[in-house]
Amino acid sequence: MRALSILGSTGSIGLSTLDVVRQHPDRFKIVGLAEGHDVNMLAEQIREFNPSIVSVRDAGSAELLKTLLGTDLPEICHGIEGAGTVAAAEGSDMVVSAIVGAAGLTPTVKAIKAGKDIALANKETLVVAGQLVSDLVKKHNVRLLPVDSEHSAIFQSLQGHRQEDVERIILTASGGPFRNSSFADMEKAGPEQALKHPQWSMGAKITIDSASMMNKGLEVIEAHWLFNMPAEKIGVVVHPQSIIHSMVEYIDGCVIAQLGSPDMRAPIAYALSWPERCESGIKKLDLATIGTLTFEEPDMVRFPALRLAFDALKAGRTYPAVLNAANEVAVAAFLNNKIGFTAIAETVDKTMQAHEAYTPVELEEYINADGWARRAANAIIG
Protein backbone atom coordinates (compact mmCIF):
# COMPACT_ATOMS: atom_id res chain seq x y z
CA MET A 1 0.00 0.00 0.00
CA ARG A 2 1.49 3.33 -1.11
CA ALA A 3 0.40 6.35 0.93
CA LEU A 4 0.03 9.53 -1.13
CA SER A 5 -0.34 13.25 -0.61
CA ILE A 6 -1.47 15.29 -3.62
CA LEU A 7 -0.53 18.94 -4.04
CA GLY A 8 -3.04 20.43 -6.47
CA SER A 9 -5.77 17.86 -5.95
CA THR A 10 -8.56 19.81 -7.70
CA GLY A 11 -6.54 20.58 -10.84
CA SER A 12 -6.29 18.49 -14.00
CA ILE A 13 -3.40 16.31 -12.78
CA GLY A 14 -4.88 16.00 -9.31
CA LEU A 15 -8.20 14.78 -10.66
CA SER A 16 -6.49 12.27 -12.96
CA THR A 17 -4.36 11.05 -10.05
CA LEU A 18 -7.42 10.48 -7.89
CA ASP A 19 -9.04 8.59 -10.75
CA VAL A 20 -6.07 6.20 -10.81
CA VAL A 21 -6.21 5.88 -7.01
CA ARG A 22 -9.95 5.20 -7.21
CA GLN A 23 -9.26 2.19 -9.45
CA HIS A 24 -6.79 0.67 -6.97
CA PRO A 25 -8.01 0.96 -3.36
CA ASP A 26 -5.79 -2.02 -2.51
CA ARG A 27 -2.62 -0.27 -3.74
CA PHE A 28 -3.01 3.40 -2.85
CA LYS A 29 -4.42 5.47 -0.02
CA ILE A 30 -4.68 9.25 0.37
CA VAL A 31 -3.03 10.88 3.39
CA GLY A 32 -3.08 14.54 2.36
CA LEU A 33 -4.70 16.87 -0.19
CA ALA A 34 -3.86 20.49 -1.04
CA GLU A 35 -5.84 22.71 -3.40
CA GLY A 36 -6.00 26.37 -4.30
CA HIS A 37 -9.22 27.20 -6.09
CA ASP A 38 -12.16 24.84 -5.52
CA VAL A 39 -13.14 24.27 -1.90
CA ASN A 40 -16.39 22.55 -2.84
CA MET A 41 -14.56 19.95 -4.90
CA LEU A 42 -12.01 19.46 -2.13
CA ALA A 43 -14.87 18.78 0.30
CA GLU A 44 -16.13 16.04 -2.04
CA GLN A 45 -12.62 14.56 -2.25
CA ILE A 46 -12.30 14.55 1.54
CA ARG A 47 -15.60 12.68 1.89
CA GLU A 48 -14.48 10.07 -0.65
CA PHE A 49 -10.80 9.58 0.25
CA ASN A 50 -10.73 10.50 3.96
CA PRO A 51 -7.32 12.22 4.17
CA SER A 52 -5.91 13.07 7.59
CA ILE A 53 -4.64 16.53 6.54
CA VAL A 54 -5.65 19.06 3.87
CA SER A 55 -4.70 22.57 2.82
CA VAL A 56 -6.67 25.34 1.11
CA ARG A 57 -5.78 28.72 -0.37
CA ASP A 58 -6.45 31.03 2.59
CA ALA A 59 -8.10 31.33 6.00
CA GLY A 60 -11.48 32.18 4.46
CA SER A 61 -11.40 28.99 2.39
CA ALA A 62 -10.51 27.03 5.53
CA GLU A 63 -13.61 28.35 7.31
CA LEU A 64 -15.77 27.54 4.28
CA LEU A 65 -14.38 24.00 4.21
CA LYS A 66 -15.22 23.51 7.90
CA THR A 67 -18.78 24.65 7.19
CA LEU A 68 -19.11 22.29 4.21
CA LEU A 69 -17.78 19.27 6.11
CA GLY A 70 -19.46 19.82 9.47
CA THR A 71 -18.07 17.21 11.85
CA ASP A 72 -15.27 14.65 11.55
CA LEU A 73 -12.79 17.14 10.13
CA PRO A 74 -9.25 16.41 8.95
CA GLU A 75 -6.47 18.76 10.03
CA ILE A 76 -6.97 21.91 7.89
CA CYS A 77 -4.10 24.22 6.88
CA HIS A 78 -3.95 27.09 4.41
CA GLY A 79 -1.61 29.00 2.09
CA ILE A 80 1.77 27.94 0.74
CA GLU A 81 2.79 27.09 4.31
CA GLY A 82 -0.22 24.81 4.53
CA ALA A 83 0.67 23.08 1.27
CA GLY A 84 4.16 22.55 2.67
CA THR A 85 2.70 21.05 5.83
CA VAL A 86 0.68 18.60 3.73
CA ALA A 87 3.78 17.82 1.65
CA ALA A 88 5.82 16.92 4.72
CA ALA A 89 3.02 15.23 6.69
CA GLU A 90 3.74 11.98 8.48
CA GLY A 91 2.15 8.87 7.07
CA SER A 92 2.75 9.50 3.36
CA ASP A 93 5.64 8.02 1.41
CA MET A 94 5.02 9.78 -1.93
CA VAL A 95 3.93 13.31 -2.80
CA VAL A 96 2.33 14.11 -6.15
CA SER A 97 3.54 17.63 -6.94
CA ALA A 98 0.88 19.11 -9.23
CA ILE A 99 0.47 22.72 -8.11
CA VAL A 100 0.62 24.95 -11.19
CA GLY A 101 3.64 27.22 -11.61
CA ALA A 102 6.50 28.29 -9.38
CA ALA A 103 4.13 28.17 -6.38
CA GLY A 104 4.79 24.42 -6.32
CA LEU A 105 8.52 24.83 -5.62
CA THR A 106 8.54 25.46 -1.86
CA PRO A 107 6.09 22.65 -0.93
CA THR A 108 8.01 20.22 -3.15
CA VAL A 109 11.29 21.14 -1.47
CA LYS A 110 9.66 20.56 1.93
CA ALA A 111 8.47 17.12 0.78
CA ILE A 112 11.98 16.18 -0.35
CA LYS A 113 13.49 17.35 2.94
CA ALA A 114 10.91 15.21 4.75
CA GLY A 115 12.14 12.15 2.84
CA LYS A 116 9.16 11.73 0.52
CA ASP A 117 9.44 10.29 -2.97
CA ILE A 118 8.15 12.81 -5.52
CA ALA A 119 5.86 12.17 -8.49
CA LEU A 120 6.64 15.40 -10.30
CA ALA A 121 4.00 17.04 -12.49
CA ASN A 122 5.09 20.56 -11.52
CA LYS A 123 7.85 21.08 -14.08
CA GLU A 124 8.49 24.60 -12.78
CA THR A 125 10.15 23.10 -9.70
CA LEU A 126 13.07 21.95 -11.85
CA VAL A 127 12.93 24.88 -14.26
CA VAL A 128 13.26 27.43 -11.46
CA ALA A 129 15.60 25.58 -9.09
CA GLY A 130 16.92 22.52 -10.88
CA GLN A 131 20.35 22.49 -9.24
CA LEU A 132 18.97 22.96 -5.74
CA VAL A 133 16.28 20.30 -6.15
CA SER A 134 18.68 17.79 -7.74
CA ASP A 135 21.13 18.26 -4.86
CA LEU A 136 18.36 17.82 -2.28
CA VAL A 137 17.08 14.65 -3.97
CA LYS A 138 20.55 13.12 -3.65
CA LYS A 139 21.08 14.39 -0.10
CA HIS A 140 17.80 12.98 1.20
CA ASN A 141 17.95 9.80 -0.92
CA VAL A 142 14.49 10.14 -2.42
CA ARG A 143 13.17 9.24 -5.87
CA LEU A 144 12.06 11.90 -8.34
CA LEU A 145 9.64 10.24 -10.76
CA PRO A 146 8.35 12.19 -13.78
CA VAL A 147 4.63 12.60 -14.40
CA ASP A 148 4.79 14.73 -17.56
CA SER A 149 3.96 12.36 -20.42
CA GLU A 150 7.15 13.27 -22.30
CA HIS A 151 9.47 12.74 -19.36
CA SER A 152 7.68 9.56 -18.36
CA ALA A 153 8.27 8.33 -21.91
CA ILE A 154 11.98 9.16 -21.69
CA PHE A 155 12.20 7.52 -18.27
CA GLN A 156 10.56 4.35 -19.60
CA SER A 157 12.75 4.34 -22.73
CA LEU A 158 15.90 4.58 -20.59
CA GLN A 159 15.06 1.58 -18.40
CA GLY A 160 17.72 -1.13 -18.67
CA HIS A 161 20.18 1.03 -20.61
CA ARG A 162 23.43 2.77 -19.69
CA GLN A 163 23.59 6.57 -19.56
CA GLU A 164 26.79 6.55 -21.62
CA ASP A 165 24.99 4.74 -24.46
CA VAL A 166 22.50 7.58 -24.96
CA GLU A 167 23.10 9.75 -28.04
CA ARG A 168 20.23 12.16 -27.34
CA ILE A 169 16.68 12.37 -26.07
CA ILE A 170 13.86 13.60 -28.30
CA LEU A 171 10.80 15.30 -26.83
CA THR A 172 7.67 15.25 -28.97
CA ALA A 173 5.30 18.22 -29.23
CA SER A 174 1.78 18.30 -30.65
CA GLY A 175 2.36 21.73 -32.16
CA GLY A 176 -0.73 23.06 -30.40
CA PRO A 177 -3.70 24.84 -31.98
CA PHE A 178 -1.49 27.24 -33.98
CA ARG A 179 0.78 24.64 -35.60
CA ASN A 180 -0.27 25.73 -39.09
CA SER A 181 -1.08 29.37 -38.29
CA SER A 182 0.88 32.34 -39.61
CA PHE A 183 2.53 34.74 -37.19
CA ALA A 184 0.04 37.39 -38.31
CA ASP A 185 -2.87 35.11 -37.39
CA MET A 186 -1.32 34.36 -34.00
CA GLU A 187 -0.97 38.09 -33.34
CA LYS A 188 -4.76 38.36 -33.61
CA ALA A 189 -5.58 35.19 -31.65
CA GLY A 190 -7.41 35.45 -28.34
CA PRO A 191 -7.67 33.10 -25.35
CA GLU A 192 -10.62 31.21 -26.85
CA GLN A 193 -8.57 30.04 -29.84
CA ALA A 194 -5.41 29.39 -27.82
CA LEU A 195 -7.28 27.20 -25.32
CA LYS A 196 -8.42 24.75 -28.02
CA HIS A 197 -5.70 22.11 -27.73
CA PRO A 198 -6.01 19.50 -30.49
CA GLN A 199 -5.12 16.46 -28.34
CA TRP A 200 -4.82 17.01 -24.60
CA SER A 201 -7.33 18.11 -21.96
CA MET A 202 -5.36 20.27 -19.51
CA GLY A 203 -5.58 23.36 -17.33
CA ALA A 204 -5.63 26.85 -18.86
CA LYS A 205 -2.02 27.83 -18.12
CA ILE A 206 -0.39 24.71 -19.57
CA THR A 207 -2.74 24.84 -22.58
CA ILE A 208 -1.57 28.38 -23.39
CA ASP A 209 2.04 27.26 -22.87
CA SER A 210 1.42 24.44 -25.34
CA ALA A 211 0.03 26.91 -27.87
CA SER A 212 3.16 29.09 -27.60
CA MET A 213 5.48 26.04 -27.33
CA MET A 214 6.80 27.47 -24.07
CA ASN A 215 5.58 24.26 -22.45
CA LYS A 216 7.99 22.29 -24.62
CA GLY A 217 10.74 24.74 -23.71
CA LEU A 218 10.08 24.25 -20.00
CA GLU A 219 10.11 20.49 -20.61
CA VAL A 220 13.54 20.78 -22.26
CA ILE A 221 14.88 22.40 -19.08
CA GLU A 222 13.13 19.81 -16.93
CA ALA A 223 14.62 17.00 -19.03
CA HIS A 224 18.10 18.45 -18.55
CA TRP A 225 17.80 18.07 -14.78
CA LEU A 226 15.86 14.79 -14.70
CA PHE A 227 18.18 12.92 -17.05
CA ASN A 228 21.47 14.82 -16.68
CA MET A 229 21.47 15.78 -20.36
CA PRO A 230 23.12 18.90 -21.82
CA ALA A 231 21.02 21.13 -24.08
CA GLU A 232 22.93 19.85 -27.11
CA LYS A 233 21.62 16.33 -26.47
CA ILE A 234 17.96 17.34 -26.15
CA GLY A 235 15.90 17.54 -29.33
CA VAL A 236 12.30 18.50 -30.07
CA VAL A 237 10.14 17.19 -32.89
CA VAL A 238 6.53 18.14 -33.66
CA HIS A 239 4.28 15.07 -33.73
CA PRO A 240 0.66 16.21 -34.20
CA GLN A 241 -0.98 12.89 -33.32
CA SER A 242 0.52 12.86 -29.78
CA ILE A 243 0.85 9.07 -29.83
CA ILE A 244 4.63 8.84 -29.47
CA HIS A 245 5.22 10.64 -26.20
CA SER A 246 9.01 10.93 -26.56
CA MET A 247 12.06 8.93 -27.64
CA VAL A 248 15.64 8.07 -26.77
CA GLU A 249 18.25 7.68 -29.49
CA TYR A 250 21.24 5.49 -28.66
CA ILE A 251 24.80 5.55 -29.98
CA ASP A 252 24.14 2.54 -32.23
CA GLY A 253 21.47 4.49 -34.14
CA CYS A 254 18.53 2.69 -32.53
CA VAL A 255 15.63 4.74 -31.19
CA ILE A 256 13.38 3.52 -28.38
CA ALA A 257 10.02 5.26 -28.03
CA GLN A 258 7.01 5.04 -25.73
CA LEU A 259 3.57 5.13 -27.35
CA GLY A 260 0.08 5.43 -25.92
CA SER A 261 -3.21 7.26 -26.09
CA PRO A 262 -2.92 10.94 -25.04
CA ASP A 263 -4.26 10.54 -21.50
CA MET A 264 -2.38 11.74 -18.41
CA ARG A 265 -3.61 8.82 -16.33
CA ALA A 266 -1.00 6.58 -18.01
CA PRO A 267 2.14 8.45 -16.89
CA ILE A 268 0.52 9.11 -13.51
CA ALA A 269 -0.16 5.40 -13.00
CA TYR A 270 3.42 4.57 -13.98
CA ALA A 271 4.87 7.07 -11.50
CA LEU A 272 2.61 5.87 -8.68
CA SER A 273 3.25 2.16 -9.24
CA TRP A 274 6.91 2.18 -10.39
CA PRO A 275 8.83 -0.12 -10.63
CA GLU A 276 5.65 -2.09 -11.30
CA ARG A 277 2.71 -1.12 -13.51
CA CYS A 278 -1.01 -0.88 -12.86
CA GLU A 279 -4.21 -0.42 -14.84
CA SER A 280 -4.64 3.28 -15.68
CA GLY A 281 -8.09 3.27 -17.27
CA ILE A 282 -6.94 4.82 -20.54
CA LYS A 283 -8.16 3.80 -23.97
CA LYS A 284 -6.01 1.05 -25.47
CA LEU A 285 -3.93 2.07 -28.48
CA ASP A 286 -5.13 0.91 -31.91
CA LEU A 287 -2.39 1.78 -34.40
CA ALA A 288 -4.31 0.43 -37.39
CA THR A 289 -7.12 2.88 -36.68
CA ILE A 290 -4.69 5.78 -36.22
CA GLY A 291 -3.03 4.84 -39.50
CA THR A 292 -0.38 7.54 -39.84
CA LEU A 293 2.16 9.13 -37.53
CA THR A 294 3.82 12.30 -38.82
CA PHE A 295 6.72 14.48 -37.70
CA GLU A 296 7.93 18.03 -38.35
CA GLU A 297 10.76 20.29 -37.25
CA PRO A 298 9.61 22.96 -34.77
CA ASP A 299 9.54 26.51 -36.17
CA MET A 300 11.41 28.68 -33.69
CA VAL A 301 10.70 31.82 -35.71
CA ARG A 302 6.93 31.52 -35.30
CA PHE A 303 7.37 30.01 -31.84
CA PRO A 304 10.23 31.98 -30.23
CA ALA A 305 9.33 30.76 -26.73
CA LEU A 306 11.03 27.44 -27.48
CA ARG A 307 14.22 29.22 -28.53
CA LEU A 308 14.11 31.39 -25.40
CA ALA A 309 13.91 28.28 -23.22
CA PHE A 310 16.96 26.74 -24.91
CA ASP A 311 18.76 30.08 -24.45
CA ALA A 312 17.87 30.13 -20.75
CA LEU A 313 19.06 26.56 -20.25
CA LYS A 314 22.39 27.24 -21.94
CA ALA A 315 22.90 30.50 -20.03
CA GLY A 316 21.99 28.87 -16.71
CA ARG A 317 22.23 30.75 -13.41
CA THR A 318 18.94 32.57 -12.72
CA TYR A 319 17.82 32.80 -16.35
CA PRO A 320 15.50 29.74 -16.24
CA ALA A 321 13.74 31.11 -13.15
CA VAL A 322 13.30 34.47 -14.87
CA LEU A 323 12.03 32.82 -18.06
CA ASN A 324 9.42 30.90 -16.10
CA ALA A 325 8.23 33.78 -13.92
CA ALA A 326 7.95 36.22 -16.82
CA ASN A 327 6.00 33.63 -18.77
CA GLU A 328 3.56 33.04 -15.89
CA VAL A 329 2.89 36.79 -15.69
CA ALA A 330 2.49 37.11 -19.46
CA VAL A 331 0.16 34.11 -19.76
CA ALA A 332 -2.06 35.51 -16.99
CA ALA A 333 -2.13 38.87 -18.80
CA PHE A 334 -3.09 37.15 -22.06
CA LEU A 335 -5.88 35.16 -20.41
CA ASN A 336 -7.18 38.45 -18.98
CA ASN A 337 -7.08 40.04 -22.46
CA LYS A 338 -4.40 42.56 -21.45
CA ILE A 339 -1.88 41.51 -24.11
CA GLY A 340 -1.95 39.62 -27.40
CA PHE A 341 -0.78 36.04 -27.84
CA THR A 342 2.56 36.85 -29.49
CA ALA A 343 3.28 39.39 -26.74
CA ILE A 344 3.75 36.48 -24.32
CA ALA A 345 7.13 35.53 -25.80
CA GLU A 346 8.00 39.20 -26.39
CA THR A 347 7.46 39.92 -22.69
CA VAL A 348 9.63 36.96 -21.68
CA ASP A 349 12.38 38.04 -24.09
CA LYS A 350 12.43 41.63 -22.80
CA THR A 351 12.45 40.45 -19.18
CA MET A 352 15.39 38.11 -19.81
CA GLN A 353 17.31 40.87 -21.60
CA ALA A 354 16.82 43.20 -18.63
CA HIS A 355 17.98 40.61 -16.08
CA GLU A 356 21.39 40.69 -14.43
CA ALA A 357 21.88 36.99 -13.76
CA TYR A 358 23.60 35.48 -10.74
CA THR A 359 24.33 31.98 -9.46
CA PRO A 360 21.75 31.09 -6.79
CA VAL A 361 22.56 28.71 -3.96
CA GLU A 362 19.79 28.95 -1.37
CA LEU A 363 16.07 28.57 -2.04
CA GLU A 364 15.51 32.22 -1.12
CA GLU A 365 17.83 33.31 -3.95
CA TYR A 366 15.78 31.38 -6.51
CA ILE A 367 12.59 32.89 -5.09
CA ASN A 368 14.12 36.37 -5.27
CA ALA A 369 14.90 35.90 -8.98
CA ASP A 370 11.34 34.74 -9.52
CA GLY A 371 9.99 37.82 -7.74
CA TRP A 372 12.25 40.20 -9.67
CA ALA A 373 11.09 38.70 -12.98
CA ARG A 374 7.42 39.04 -12.04
CA ARG A 375 7.86 42.71 -11.20
CA ALA A 376 9.85 43.33 -14.38
CA ALA A 377 7.34 41.52 -16.60
CA ASN A 378 4.42 43.40 -15.06
CA ALA A 379 6.25 46.69 -15.68
CA ILE A 380 6.82 45.72 -19.32
CA ILE A 381 3.15 44.83 -19.77
CA GLY A 382 2.13 48.09 -18.10
From Swiss-Prot:
Q: Which InterPro entries match?
A: DXP_reductoisomerase, DXP_reductoisomerase_C, DXP_reductoisomerase_N, DXPR_C, DXPR_C_sf, NAD(P)-bd_dom_sf
SUPFAM superfamilies attached to this UniProt entry: 1-deoxy-D-xylulose-5-phosphate reductoisomerase, C-terminal domain, Glyceraldehyde-3-phosphate dehydrogenase-like, C-terminal domain, NAD(P)-binding Rossmann-fold domains
E.C. number: 1.1.1.267
Question: Which residues hold 1-deoxy-D-xylulose 5-phosphate?
Answer: 123, 149-150, 174, 197, 210, 215-216, 219
Signal peptide annotation: none
- Does the UniProt entry include the keyword rRNA processing? no
Any GO molecular function: 1-deoxy-D-xylulose-5-phosphate reductoisomerase activity
* Protein residues bound to NADPH: 10-13, 36, 122, 124, 203
Q: Which reaction does it catalyse?
A: 2-C-methyl-D-erythritol 4-phosphate + NADP(+) = 1-deoxy-D-xylulose 5-phosphate + NADPH + H(+)
Q: In which pathway does it act?
A: Isoprenoid biosynthesis; isopentenyl diphosphate biosynthesis via DXP pathway; isopentenyl diphosphate from 1-deoxy-D-xylulose 5-phosphate: step 1/6
Q: Which cofactor does it need?
A: Mg(2+); Mn(2+)
Gene3D superfamilies listed in its UniProt record: 1.10.1740.10, NAD(P)-binding Rossmann-like Domain
Q: Which NCBIfam families match?
A: Dxr, PRK12464.1
- Recorded family membership: Belongs to the DXR family.
Query: Protein name, please?
Result: 1-deoxy-D-xylulose 5-phosphate reductoisomerase
Gene source species: Chlorobium luteolum (strain DSM 273 / BCRC 81028 / 2530) (Pelodictyon luteolum)
